Amino acid sequence: MDIGPKDKISNLPEALICHILSFLPIEDSALTSVLSKRWRYLFAFRPNLVFDDSVCLRPPCGHGVIPDYVTSWILNVLERGVLDLDLQVNVNGVRLPSKVFVSKSLVRLRIESGNVRGIDVDDVFLPKLKSLYLHTIMLGKGEDCFEKLTSGCHVLEELVLNNVYSNVWNRSVSSKTLKRLTLWCTESYDKNPHSVLFDTPNLVYLKYSDYVAAKYPKVNFSSLVDATIGLAMTSDQDANASYDALVGNATDFLMGICNVQILCLSANSLAVLTFCCESIPVFNNLIQLTIKTNQSVGWESLPALLKNCPILETLVFEGLLHMYTIKCGDVDGCLCKYSGEVPSCLSSSPVKVLKILRFGEYGIVNQIEMIKIFLETMPHLEQLTVYYNTPIGGDLIEEVSSQLKNFAREASPNCEIQVIPDVLS
C-alpha cells in the first residue's frame, strides 16, 4: 500500500488553482512556477495581478522603469480584457496613453499619481465602466475633456476626480447614470473656473470642493440626498470681500442643491454664502446640517442659513470657532451674544439633536458661553452631545459636563446632555 505523500493540489482543475493563487501576494504565487512544467505559467492566469516595482526589482533599479515599458504593459492588459485596473504611477517621463480610456471590458478604473500626469483625452469608450477614480491628473488640451469622460461611460455610477484639471478652466459633468460624484480641486491653483456645469439627475451623493466659478450654466441635482460642499473664494476675492457688493456669485449652484437631506459645509463655504450669494435658498428637505468652523471665517451667513432649514433635526458643529466681525453686534448677523438679543434663527429652531465636535480647541470659555445660548434659546432641543478634545479620563470632562447641566434650560428643560472624549466621534 502506498502511504507516501500525495500532491492533491496539482490534480485540481487549473481554474481552481488560479483562484487559489489569487489570494497570495504576486511574488509568492510566482514562486510556484518552479514546481513543475504545468505550474510554470499558472500564476499568470490568476484573475488579479499586482505589479509593484519596489518588490519586483531586486535590487531596486536606481533609475526606475523605462516609461515606454509602462505604456506597453497597460495596453497589454487592456487588450486581454481586464475588468479592474488600478494604476499608481510615479515614474518620471510617463505620459499615460489615451487608450487607457478605451476598453470594452473595464468595470473599474483607478489612476493615481504622486504628481500631475498628462493624459490626452481623445476618444473615450468604456461601455461597461461603473467606477472611475482619477487623482492628480492633467487632462489634455481640449475644451470638452470632462464632458468626454462621462459621455463615453454609458453605465457609470461612481466618478471621483481629485485634483483633476485641464488646460481650459471649464468643468462639465453630465450623466444620467451617475449616482456618486466627488469633484475635489486643490486650493493651490487659486483661480476661479470659467464655467462649471452639472447635469446629473440621478445623483444621490456629491462631494464638491472648488473655487467659486464665474458661472454655473446648469445645475441639475434633482435626486440629490447627501452633499459635502467646500466652496471657497480666491485670495483676490477674499481681499476685496465687502458687505456692500458681491465678489462672486454661487447662487445658481446653491439653488441647485437646495433639495438635499444631508449637507456638510466647510468654513470657507460660509464665507461664500456671505460674499458670493444673492440670497440663501430655502432647504425644505434638509434634516441634517454639519458646519465646519475655523477662526478666520465669520458666521455672518449662519443665521439666515438656519432660518431657511424649516425641518432641520440634527445640527452638527465641527468646532465652535469663528472670526469676530462687526456683524457680531447684529442680532441676525451672528449666533454669539454680543448683540444682547436672542437670534430668531435659534428661538424658532426645529433642531432636536445638537452635536459639538472638537470642543475645547483654543480654549473653552467662549465655547461654553455659546453652548449656554443654545440651551437657553432652542425650544425643541432633546439631545446635546459635546465631543471634548481632551485626553480620555480627564477631570475636565466631568467639570464641563457638570457646568453644562447646571445651566438654566428654559427653552428645552428636558434636553439630555452628554460630554464625551472627541476620539469617539
Curated annotation (Swiss-Prot):
Coiled-coil intervals, chain numbering: none
LRR repeat coordinates: 86-113, 138-163, 185-210, 264-293, 294-319
Annotated keywords: Leucine-rich repeat, Repeat
Signal peptide start-end: none
Pfam family, one: LRR_At5g56370
Source organism superkingdom: Eukaryota
Disulfide partners: none
Keyword Metal-binding: no
Keyword DNA repair: no
Protein name: F-box/LRR-repeat protein At3g59250
